């Protein structure tokens, strides 16, 4: 009897030893562990010198606004023309949010860890977290400046899907182009050369846009760069020039 018990105990121990690495592998897979076959997009990147954001094929140069949001833009331009102190959140150290935060003239760093891609953006000390573990967007996401992002690989392309944006930010190219809390952004990151990356951004918003808007930009990788500290002056205020028009003064 004791011999049988020992045999059963040894068999159970062996099964447990075999299951541990199997369960670990399953856990890594569930966490979205990056396959070895995908390209290396890690490192510090900046918008390439001489590169400009350009619209995608067949897409208009400017976002096509609905009537409601076209009125918002017209009101903004009218106030601007009068020299009024129009809203300028960045003058008060409020981050621009998506998609503008990805178009700043400051570098950003892409960090890859199991189940997650983290983008550290020097401008306004912003961080984006892209979940690669297979999760879905929340049914009712909190509205934030950079939204809720999930991602996956399509061949050699990192595809990032983001929702849940506060309507307090702008689409660009100016603060007059507003969006709603229904804005949906899809980004496609792809290497076109060892140190060059193309990012295609497509924006859809049923309330603010009559059709999706797409733009492409090129980034250059700098292997010897580091992200540095970015401090926006506390309690900053909009300033007016000698003609009474709103503006900001940059100092260093």
Regions found by a protein language model. Give the residues of each.
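Bacterial N-terminal signal peptides
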Residues: 11-26
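PEST-like low-complexity, intrinsically disordered acidic/proline/serine-rich tracts
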Residues: 2, 27-252
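N-terminal secretory signal peptides that target proteins for export/translocation
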Residues: 1-11
């Amino acid at each position: 009897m004791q011999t049988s018990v020992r045999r059963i105990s040894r068999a159970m121990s062996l099964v447990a030893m075999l299951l541990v690495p199997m369960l670990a592998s399953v856990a890594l897979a569930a966490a979205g562990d990056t396959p070895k076959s995908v390209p290396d997009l890690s490192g510090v990147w900046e918008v390439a010198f001489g590169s400009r954001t350009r619209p995608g094929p067949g897409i208009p140069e400017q976002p096509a606004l609905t009537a409601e949001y076209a009125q918002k833009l017209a009101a903004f331009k009218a106030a601007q023309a009068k020299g009024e102190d129009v809203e300028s959140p960045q003058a008060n150290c409020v981050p621009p949010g998506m998609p503008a935060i990805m178009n700043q003239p400051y570098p950003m760093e892409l960090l890859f860890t199991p189940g997650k891609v983290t983008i550290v953006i020097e401008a306004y000390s912003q961080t984006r977290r892209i979940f690669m573990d297979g999760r879905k967007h929340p049914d009712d996401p909190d509205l934030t400046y950079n939204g809720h992002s999930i991602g996956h690989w399509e061949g050699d392309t990192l595809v990032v899907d983001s929702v849940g944006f506060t309507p307090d930010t702008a689409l660009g190219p100016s603060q007059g182009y507003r969006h709603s809390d229904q804005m949906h952004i899809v980004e496609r990151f792809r290497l076109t050369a060892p140190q060059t990356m193309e990012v295609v951004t497509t924006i859809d918003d049923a309330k603010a846009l009559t059709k999706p808007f797409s733009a492409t930009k090129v980034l250059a990788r700098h292997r010897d760069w580091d992200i540095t500290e970015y401090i926006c002056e506390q309690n900053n205020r909009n300033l007016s020039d000698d003609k009474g028009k709103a503006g900001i003064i940059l100092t260093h």
